Amino acid sequence: MEEAIMRLEGAEHRETNIHSLKRKPSRTSSTAPGSPGGVTTAKAASGAGASGVSTIRYRGVRRRPWGRYAAEIRDPLSKERRWLGTFDTAEEAACAYDCAARAMRGLKARTNFVYPMPSLDSYHHRIFSSPPMNMFLLRDVLNSQSLSPLTTFAYPPCNLSNVNDVVHESFTNVNDVCEDLSPKAKRSSTIENESLISNIFEPEPASSGLLQEIVQGFLPKPISQHASIPPKSNQQSVGVFPTMPESGFQTDVRLADFHVEGNGFGQVKYHGELGWADHENGFDSAKMQQNGNGGMFYQYCFHDDY
């Protein structure tokens, strides 16, 4: 509540100041011949016999109740007021307004002070210098002028020799780069790139990675027909197993073992396949009985022709 009351009192105090300014009698403005820079002076006609008190008013400058001066300017494009800042003296605020007006409107701007017409040389230097419309650095400009309203704003000159040196150096660098890109250099760089790519990506067959190649790697190898089909002849032949020693053999294939009886051969045990031996013709009335795993088989077995 106290803050709200203080705000209301401050608002009422501002309104009274505004009314007091509006109630001041009209002033007759005249240009004093001895005033520096054509500063406009105003004399207050308070009444007969009253001594004239001269006050200076600048364009775009307003005095704050606490004694400082605020500068602002209306933007010609957006028709809005642009805040330029608060200054200690009216001359500083007037200079800030003049800078902003000349930056927005050029030579046609209405300013508080009279400025000399810039020559062609100064205009040429101004193009290469920093942009003039820098309203946020007006304090630095005003401080360098020692608060003098008659001092003209001189922009820092641009050293064209430095610019030429920079441009010449940039062009020489471009020429060096162009010389490096000669046909020989391009050819050598192309060869190096191709060799690098060939080392990274090794050549592979056209059918690599196909499903057929993957499936064939897991399929068992086909058995040759020469080992499975017996030769035909009119005589009695003997089937010989080349991989079996004289005493017998034992294969790696885990198949069922059988007990064979008949034709005076007695009992023999074998493990694995018998090749092309035909038990029906080779063993008359043979009786085969499963008899567990493992066993031996003699090297020769007789086989009758078909």
From Swiss-Prot:
Disulfide bonds: none
GO cellular component, one term: nucleus
Single GO MF annotation: DNA binding
Location, primary (coarse class): nucleus
One of the GO BP terms on file: regulation of DNA-templated transcription
Tissue-by-tissue expression: Cotyledons, leaf primordia and shoot apical meristems.
Cellular compartments annotated: Nucleus
Keywords: Activator, Cytokinin signaling pathway, DNA-binding, Ethylene signaling pathway, Gibberellin signaling pathway, Nucleus, Transcription, Transcription regulation
Region of interest called Disordered, as start-end residue ranges on this chain: 1-46
PROSITE patterns, alphabetized: AP2_ERF
Function: Required for correct embryo patterning and cotyledon organogenesis. May positively regulate the gibberellin signaling pathway leading to germination, hypocotyl elongation, and leaf expansion. Involved in the cytokinin signaling pathway that promotes shoot regeneration, probably through transcriptional activation of target genes such as CUC1. Acts as a transcriptional activator. Binds to the GCC-box pathogenesis-related promoter element. May be involved in the regulation of gene expression by stress factors and by components of stress signal transduction pathways.
Record note on quaternary structure: Interacts with class 3 HD-ZIP proteins such as ATHB-8, CNA, PHB, PHV, and REV.
Identification of the protein by name: Ethylene-responsive transcription factor ESR2
